[in-house]
Amino acid sequence: MSWIREEKLSLLERLTANILKAGPMPKHVAFIMDGNRRYAQKEHKERQEGHTQGFEKLAETLRWCLNLGIHEVTVYAFSIENFKRSKEEVDGLMELARQKFSRLLTEQENLEKHGVCIRVLGDLTLLPEDLQTLIAKAVVSTRAHNKCFLNVCFAYTSRHEIANAVKEMAWGVEQGLIKSSDVSEVLLSECLYSSNSPNPDLLIRTSGEVRLSDFLLWQTSYSCLVFQSVLWPEYSFWNLCEAILQFQMSHRSIQKARELHREEQVLQQMESDRTCVAEILQHRGNGKPMDGQSQQNALLNYSSSREERVRGFLNTLQHKRDAFFDDLSSQAVVA
Amino acid sequence: MASLYEMVWRFLHALLYLQRAIVAWFRVHIWRWKLAVVDLLLPLALGFHNQKKTGPKGTRTSRRVRWGADGRTLEKLPLHVGLLVTEEEIHYTDIANLVVWCMAVGISYVSVYDNQGVFKRNNSRLMEEILKQQQELLGMGSSKYSVEILKNGTNKQEHQVLSCQSMVKVLSPDDGRLSIVQAAQQLCRAVEQKEKTSKDINVSVLDSLLKESKNIPDPDLVLKFGTVQSTLGFLPWHIRLTEIISMPSHIDASYDDLYDALQRFAGCEQRLGK
């Protein structure tokens, strides 16, 4: 089954889509595609069949999203915790991933036509090596596309991602690129795997479970969460519309909370800069009390040099990450 | 065409808001009627069966016994419940009631959160209200629920903690992402001073650092009050496996509402990735 579906929406679906689009729409939607195994059990099918149908549903959902004007989707494909499942099931899932990513590589033309950029978020080193290479190839070959974005969380948990971001910042400190006082909420967000995407506006979890299961904990702090009881392989266009309606009804309050949080962030950064400047001045210890104007200047100087440091560090980090994928994808040519 | 779509959209949303308002109205009023009926019937029933009136102390004891028993009959009880209020209007008495019921059922940790920091700013008012409701609902007689207000020594902020059987903690967005950032800063400082290397940092190091500053287990259940479908910054690190149950409003919330949510929680099965 292909990643990209070209069918158009039916008339009724199109009408509904247009009505929904008259209101605020989410730009980025995240899915926890839960219920594949329960679906297989219900339909008396093989477990693997459930997962396969789950993938097909994903392709269909991507088409709906595109038709609804949602250009970024993040999905939870495989959690680090899922490695605890039976060997048979884990192997089956890895095989499915192999198939789908190989298939993806044969669909280059189509992906280019639609401008689909695929990113894989997670700790790839936990995966079998051949799969790592396949994934890296898919990521590298679609890197330049910029019309729609699909982020696949694979070998991912949010805590792992956050801990990894802290590790990267500590690495930056070790390399002398940043100081420990430069660590801030904004910087941490930029060090996550998801640094190139805006935070999701809407998170949908199917199959009636009401928890996040270690998915995008940081990024969805101020997102609309919708829990739906339908099993993922049975997800329909109308379920998606219902979730969007819920998003629209919460939209104003969430927007307000986000705004408040942003203001808080700016204040914190200013406070931290002020403390750092005060420390520096104390260190110099020339004892002269500074007037307001030169204090202001010192603060401005400090914050612009901090911003430059952080920019430099983030550039280096991006290069490091790109290089990781480049190396992996070129390995296959040798092999 | 676009304006037609917009009209339909507006109409649709007006209908949805109307439906929401009607449901909320019924919820409040049915509850009030129920109370009125119970008030009317209970004295009658007691009057018929028991000439000696038990009085308020008696009903308090029986209620307390019932709540405790409810807690024991549930298959599993959360260790830590977070009360997340997303509403603009806050009723302290209703929140205090919920906290006291949680304690009576046998929940060890209760935290109260709103994203604007209202509870944190009015910490003492909330604590007073909790004490008051505790006496009102549970009565003075029991030493089991005696409450001490402690200053939290480890933290520089003056969190007041009700200790003994249950602990109540007031949380704000500062305990969420910001506390992760602070932990990150602490680790980076250690790296800067060559006490640690970046390779030492992993999930468990960060987790233990974040546990230390909070001193409470991760919440297993969050009760989210209000129509806003979001956690609004509630402890992102800690809600990894938390069940999030939505309730329409904390205003006039009843013990039965809470008990229903606890029952739902008891029915949830966690597979932990398997």
Swiss-Prot record, chain B:
Keywords: Endoplasmic reticulum, Glycoprotein, Magnesium, Membrane, Receptor, Transferase, Transmembrane, Transmembrane helix. It is an enzyme of class 2 (transferase). Glycans are attached at N122. Signal peptide: none annotated. Gene3D superfamilies: Decaprenyl diphosphate synthase-like (3.40.1180.10). Pathway: Protein modification; protein glycosylation. It is a multi-pass membrane protein. It holds the Pfam family Prenyltransf. Its cofactor is Mg(2+). It catalyses: n isopentenyl diphosphate + (2E,6E)-farnesyl diphosphate = a di-trans,poly-cis-polyprenyl diphosphate + n diphosphate. GO terms for molecular function: ditrans,polycis-polyprenyl diphosphate synthase [(2E,6E)-farnesyl diphosphate specific] activity. GO terms for cellular component: dehydrodolichyl diphosphate synthase complex; endoplasmic reticulum membrane. With DHDDS, forms the dehydrodolichyl diphosphate synthase (DDS) complex, an essential component of the dolichol monophosphate (Dol-P) biosynthetic machinery. Adds multiple copies of isopentenyl pyrophosphate (IPP) to farnesyl pyrophosphate (FPP) to produce dehydrodolichyl diphosphate (Dedol-PP), a precursor of dolichol which is utilized as a sugar carrier in protein glycosylation in the endoplasmic reticulum (ER). Regulates the glycosylation and stability of nascent NPC2, thereby promoting trafficking of LDL-derived cholesterol. The active dehydrodolichyl diphosphate synthase complex is a heterotetramer composed of a dimer of heterodimer of dhdds and nus1. This is Dehydrodolichyl diphosphate synthase complex subunit nus1. It comes from Danio rerio (Zebrafish). The gene is nus1.
